[in-house]
UniProtKB/Swiss-Prot annotation:
Membrane-side (Extracellular) residue stretches: 33-47, 106-118, 180-197
Keywords associated with the record: Cell membrane, Electron transport, Heme, Iron, Membrane, Metal-binding, Oxidoreductase, Phosphoprotein, Translocase, Transmembrane, Transmembrane helix, Transport
Inducing stimuli: By iron deficiency. Up-regulated in duodenal mucosa of mice lacking transferrin or Hfe (at protein level).
Highest taxon of source: Eukaryota
Pfam families (alphabetical): Cytochrom_B561
Official protein name in the record: Plasma membrane ascorbate-dependent reductase CYBRD1
Gene3D superfamilies: 1.20.120.1770
Main location: membrane
GO biological process per UniProt: ascorbate homeostasis; intracellular iron ion homeostasis; multicellular organismal-level iron ion homeostasis; response to iron ion
Length: 290
């Protein structure tokens, strides 16, 4: 199936990938050039893993996981395969985010810095906990085959909304963290005097913001949504559970097929059904008067 507005989608996708990749490159340049590099010894070098892993995993990889269903050249792949890729990317993002938080806590322990005192830390840790919860719920409800369609119908809109909300929250948290770090480390010259590190890192923040905006735009365009697979039935709750409506859809489809195959047979079947309904009503009336 051809995608409507394919060229526009492709342009935005390439732009998002380019801006996201530049964000990762910029955060690496920041810590390697301006912040003395990376390490795992309780010093500031260990802390530097925090922005690198947060931007790479929690922002860039999570953004790709959000739009993976929108890639038109994957529409011929099975839904199970795409679910596995979506879950795998989110799992990688969660692992990198966890390691980034561990690096911060170890740095604070060694340097005797208080934990969890800033708004950045409150929002960031909350987002990580909810992100892991979202990943676990999605795994058991959507990836494993045991969940009933009615449960999936209930969870799906919550899953979509909370995923986008968490992605936006993560971007806001990263921007808060970058600004907070610059206020701490830029003393001579100070942040407000426009030092090269401050300007460079502000540019990193703008790249992250643009990447998030592109991902939000791509994932909210209805014409770029992955089409339903042939024979599938949308998960809805209005008017009964999903399983009942699936059976009803199959019955309706069968009736249409019979009509198209032989109009005479369809007419005789309709007349027979009418006679049965008449007899049934008569029989029902007799039973009600007995």
């Amino acid at each position: 199936m051809a995608m409507e507005g394919y060229r526009g989608f492709l342009g935005l996708l390439v732009s998002a990938l380019l801006v996201g990749f530049l964000s990762v490159i910029f955060v690496l340049i920041w810590v390697l050039h301006f912040r003395e590099g990376l390490g795992w010894n309780g010093s500031g070098l260990e802390f530097n893993w925090h922005p690198v892993l947060a931007v790479t995993g929690f922002v860039f990889i999570q953004g790709i996981a959000i739009i993976v269903y929108r890639l038109p050249w994957t529409w011929k792949c099975s839904k199970l395969l795409m679910k596995s890729i979506h879950a795998g990317l989110n799992a990688v993002a969660a692992i990198l985010a966890i390691i980034s938080v561990v690096a911060v806590f170890e740095y604070h322990n060694v340097q005797k810095v208080p934990h969890m005192y800033s708004l950045h830390s409150w929002v960031g840790l909350t987002a990580l906990i909810l992100y892991i919860q979202q990943l676990v719920v999605g795994f058991f409800v959507f990836l494993l085959p045991w969940a009933p369609p009615s449960l999936r119908a209930i969870v799906m809109p919550i899953h979509v909304y909370s995923g986008l909300l968490l992605f936006g929250t993560v971007i806001a948290t990263v921007l808060m963290g970058v600004t907070e770090k610059l206020f701490f480390v830029l003393k001579h010259p100070s942040y407000h005097s426009f030092p090269p590190e401050g300007v460079f890192t502000n540019t990193l923040g703008l790249l992250i913001l643009v990447f998030g905006a592109l991902i939000f735009w791509i994932v909210t365009r209805p014409q770029w949504k992955r089409p339903r697979e042939p024979g599938s039935v949308p998960l809805q709750l209005n008017g009964g559970n999903a399983e009942c409506r699936m059976e009803g859809a199959i019955a309706i489809s069968s009736a249409h097929s019979m009509d198209a195959a032989d109009p005479a047979d369809a007419e005789s079947s309709s007349e027979g059904a009418a006679r049965k309904r008449t007899l049934g009503l008569a029989d029902s009336g007799q039973r009600s008067t007995m």
